[in-house]
Structures are given as C-alpha cells and as structure tokens.
Amino acid sequence: MITDYEWPLWQTTALVCGIDEAGRGPLAGPVVAAAVIFPRWFRPVGTILERVNDSKKLSAAERELLAPAIRNAAAFWAVAEVDPETIDQINILQATMLAMNQAVAALPIQPELLLVDGNRFRTELPIPYETVVKGDSKVFSIAAASVLAKTHRDELMVAYASEYPQYGFERHVGYPTRAHVEAIRQHGRCPIHRQSFRLRQLGEKP
C-alpha cells in the first residue's frame, strides 16, 4: 500500500493523522487505538512499508516486522488503551471512541485532519475528520495505525497470559474462540474479562 489517499490532502494539509482500533470484539482485555502522522509527501515505495495493510490481512510475524518500521518512519504516533472496566461502564462503542480520542490527544502535536477507519466517529477535539469505510485497506495512514494498535494489544494480552495461564490469552488474545469459551466455562471470568460481554454458549442472557 502507498500514500495515494494522503497526497491530495497534503496539498493543503500537512498534518494528516490516520486512526484505527484493535480489540472491539474480544471477551477480555482493553480496546486499543493508535494515531499515526507521516511526514508530508511521504512515500513508502521501495521500503518494507509497501507491505503495510489492514492488520487483519497480515500475519503476526508481518505485523511484528512492520510495527517498528512504522514507528521509525512516522513523524508522530501514539497509542491509547481503554480498560475492560470502562468498557463495561460505557459500552464498547463509546470505549472505542474514547480510545481514539485519547490516542490523538497523546500526540505531541495537534493534527490538522483525522482519517478514521469506519463509518462513525465522535471527536472531543476541535479537529476536522473524515471517516473512511474499510479505511484500513485503502488509506496508508489508517492501515499503519491498525498495525500499531493490533501489535500493542497483542503484546498486552501475551503479558496477561502469564498472569492468567488457564485462559490461553497468548493464543487467542481474548477473542471468543471455542477454547476460550471452554476456559471461561471451567474457570469463570478473570479480572480482565469484559463482564458486559455475555455468552450464549454458556446460557448467559444479554
């Protein structure tokens, strides 16, 4: 992927920021968002960053290779987490919006334009934004943000696996796999599980 989407925007706007999240669907762990600003007129042609894509289309090894390259090439980047307790309090959609806003606020400079994956966004900041459906497959900056968010969250979940080894977080990173649901059936939920995410497989009602 290259920066074709950003180039027309860079004609008038220097600080274009891509935003994406990871972790809306899991039963455990935080939702994570990343915000990435590349230098104006940046082109990844001829570099490893040509391989940047929607994090879901990349293998774990590819993401781990690309993440440090993205951080090195970016002018600015930031990552933010919203914990399971907050997700339970305000719901996953609101928690995702909060994480995205926190990631932007954590940047050392205020962007001039936000490019957000998806079809909805609610900003707490006085910054113009565009939502881009399937933006992580179309917009380089958003795809890069998706890789940073995903790798950051996966690292957190692998760390949690040593604290709660009975759940196998290092394998499914909190997603509702059959093995994860069975572990919850056997051991109940642990402190990083989202209590508001109910499981029909266990006879739980919404």
From Swiss-Prot:
Keyword Transmembrane: no
Species assigned in the record: Pelodictyon phaeoclathratiforme (strain DSM 5477 / BU-1)
EC number in record: 3.1.26.4
Keyword vocabulary terms for this entry: Cytoplasm, Endonuclease, Hydrolase, Manganese, Metal-binding, Nuclease
InterPro entries associated with the record: RNase_HII, RNase_HII/HIII, RNase_HII/HIII_dom, RNaseH-like_sf, RNaseH_sf
Family membership noted in the UniProt record: Belongs to the RNase HII family.
Keyword Ribonucleoprotein: no
Cofactor notes: Manganese or magnesium. Binds 1 divalent metal ion per monomer in the absence of substrate. May bind a second metal ion after substrate binding.
Major localization class: cytoplasm
Subcellular location as annotated: Cytoplasm
CDD domains given in the database record: RNase_HII_bacteria_HII_like (cd07182)
Pfam families: RNase_HII
Protein name: Ribonuclease HII
Catalytic activity: Endonucleolytic cleavage to 5'-phosphomonoester
Boundaries of every RNase H type-2 domain copy: 14-206
